[in-house]
Regions:
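Active-site-proximal, Lys/Arg-enriched surface segment
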Residues: 1-64, 74
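An internal, acidic/charged active-site-proximal segment
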Residues: 70-172
């Protein structure tokens, strides 16, 4: 269907698998099955009009254990330069490629699996794109330019503090 691009959709698709010989197969969440099981997962970026969507980037996700297994990589012919990247890192790479290719822009739409990643949201903003992201209820989001107070100074005893602090002027 014709019409202007309204959104760039980041999502992943899982493919249930029996056995462990296909590239990237691991016990991980499989959306098709609604539970953890052996599957492959691909991260995609699709462009959407009001009536239709079309995937423009698609990349197989390699779980960390699989990406680090030299024997499996060699058997499958996975090039050395391919290293582990999280799903949000793959998504941000795809968005950067779409911007570099001059694809028609739209707001980036992502579910909580991607939207909860601060670096992804920040990267999308740095590219001058707006986004609509699902986030977990316990995630603090700060207005642009507003920052939390830093953790308390370390007293020299115990573990160094790492929790951010809030006060009247520092609120998410």
């Amino acid at each position: 269907k014709h019409g202007p691009i309204e959104a760039w959709i980041i999502d992943d698709t899982s493919f249930p698998k029996k056995g462990r010989h296909s590239v990237g197969v691991a016990r991980q969440y499989c959306g098709q099955l609604g539970k953890q099981d052996n599957c492959q997962v691909a991260v995609s970026l699709s462009l959407a009009t009001h009536a239709a969507s079309l995937p423009v980037f698609y990349r197989l996700y390699l779980p960390d254990d699989w990406a680090a297994d030299r024997v499996c990589r060699r058997k499958a012919g996975v090039p050395e330069e391919i290293t582990f990247q999280s799903k949000p890192e793959i998504a941000l790479d795809q968005i950067r490629q779409a911007v570099a290719a001059g694809l028609p822009r739209g707001s980036v739409v992502m579910d909580v699996g991607y939207g909860n990643d601060t670096q992804l949201r920040a990267g999308v903003s740095q590219l001058g794109l707006s986004y609509l992201a699902g986030i977990q209820a316990n995630t603090s989001v700060w207005a642009q330019g507003a920052l939390p107070r830093p953790p308390k100074a370390w007293s020299g005893r115990g573990r160094p503090p790492k929790l951010i602090r809030r006060d009247e002027q520092h609120q998410p």
